[in-house]
From Swiss-Prot:
Listed Gene3D superfamilies: Aldolase class I
EC class of the enzyme, as a word: isomerase
Annotated source species: Sinorhizobium medicae (strain WSM419)
Name of the protein in its database record: N-(5'-phosphoribosyl)anthranilate isomerase
Pathways per UniProt: Amino-acid biosynthesis; L-tryptophan biosynthesis; L-tryptophan from chorismate: step 3/5
Amino acid sequence: MKTEVKICGLKTAEALQRAVALGASHTGFIFFPKSPRNIEPDDAGRLAELARGRAKIVAVTVDADNDDLDEIVSALHPEVLQLHGSENPERVLAIKALYGLPVIKALPIREASDLERIAPYIGIADRFLLDAKPPAGSDLPGGNGVSFDWRLLDALDANVDYMLSGGLNASNVEDALALTGARAIDTSSGVESAPGIKDLTLMDAFFEAIRRAEA
């Protein structure tokens, strides 16, 4: 089965076009000023047209208010919203009602008890993004290049639709797929030469590793 792959934090046409050419199913644009991958909505909207119809356009936000979401949705016309902050189930439901878009809810995982965070969102979030908890002192909820113990997902209900995230790169993605059986994965820092700088060679290697895992 072909793995769904989201390349997140895209900021240039070159990186976006390479991701799509390599077979990315989702392209992620991050709207969070503290992130080195932050992009202005109008810039993201122009970039997204290079991928529209070939990969899903995902807007990634962190505890954004309605004014910010209005601006992002108007400029980008995303097909999916990824909520990567502390949005509670009621907020997720309100956002879905407001925009009529499917929602990926990101949840931080470090230990088995963190999987209990999923249950309140069942039937509300359309999919989960299971990411490693940020290291102490980090201002970023994701894109930190750290992984969690993938064996924790052995306890996950098989019906939970999720994307695996957190420190995935060409050197570990085969193991991650083999251990978890994940059908969808996400990376950002794993295909960068520096924070926010996508590296086409690393992107090539990442997809090569995924195809080996699928063989």
